[in-house]
């Protein structure tokens, strides 16, 4: 196919998987996969982590974000592994390990599209949210993709669908470390000596110091998650 109409119910009788789109940009793919979810399960959706900058949009998206969208389908990687750093290869190994652990839920669980609300009930349109629940309702994966960072933004909430109301769930997120180079010359707000952005010194420091990501760790009932939700830790807001 050179464009749309790739998915055909008749063809799915003969082949178990269809390539969703030649556009592998994670922001675009989130919308594409969101649309496919109205008619097709994740188990037939080919979804890949590709190079950054993306070949279709030239957008730079972090590896962990590209994985977060691609894992909501049949995960694959279309990267030249010989071009990746040791850190990126280690991250991919962890991603594949995580995907294998949760593959049954991600591919065969019930897929829910979630509406987002910020504080005081304000509707949040700057994020794509999904949660995928195992057939027995005991396990689930939540995915949130922030489209853009806004300054002074209020906390986001995790409000689910499909969880067992009377079950106790342990809610936690992936433990991630972030490259300090993503903060640009903000490093000079804490560095005792001037550090030029993208310099050799900047690169050397990135191998020694990494930023901790947000931490989520909650014990809560399915009823609370489905009906009220829980506030998430604040990310970078400027």
Predicted regions and their residues:
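Active-site proximal loops enriched in glycine and acidic residues that flank catalytic Cys/His/Asp
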Residues: 1-3, 79-83, 143-146, 162, ...
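Carbohydrate-binding surface patches
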Residues: 119-165
């Amino acid at each position: 196919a050179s464009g749309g109409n790739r998915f055909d119910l008749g063809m799915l009788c003969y082949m178990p998987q269809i390539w969703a789109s030649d556009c592998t940009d994670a922001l675009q793919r989130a919308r594409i996969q969101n649309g496919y979810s109205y008619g097709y399960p994740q188990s037939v959706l080919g979804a890949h982590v590709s190079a950054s900058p993306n070949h279709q949009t030239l957008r730079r998206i972090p590896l962990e974000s590209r994985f977060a969208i691609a894992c909501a389908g049949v995960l694959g990687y279309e990267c030249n592994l010989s071009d990746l750093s040791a850190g990126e290869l280690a991250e991919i190994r962890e991603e594949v390990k995580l995907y294998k652990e949760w593959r049954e839920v991600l591919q065969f669980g019930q897929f829910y599209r979630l509406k987002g609300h910020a504080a005081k009930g304000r509707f949040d349109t700057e994020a794509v949210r999904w949660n995928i629940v195992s057939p027995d309702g005991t396990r689930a994966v939540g995915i949130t993709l922030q489209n853009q960072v806004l300054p002074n933004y209020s906390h986001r909430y995790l409000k689910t669908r499909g969880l067992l109301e009377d079950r106790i769930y342990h809610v936690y997120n992936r433990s991630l470390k972030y490259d300090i180079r993503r903060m640009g010359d903000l490093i000079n707000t804490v560095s005792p000596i001037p550090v030029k952005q993208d310099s050799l010194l900047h690169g050397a420091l990135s191998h020694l110091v990494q930023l901790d990501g947000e931490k989520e760790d909650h014990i809560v009932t399915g009823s609370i998650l489905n009906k009220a939700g829980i506030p998430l830790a604040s990310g970078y807001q400027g």
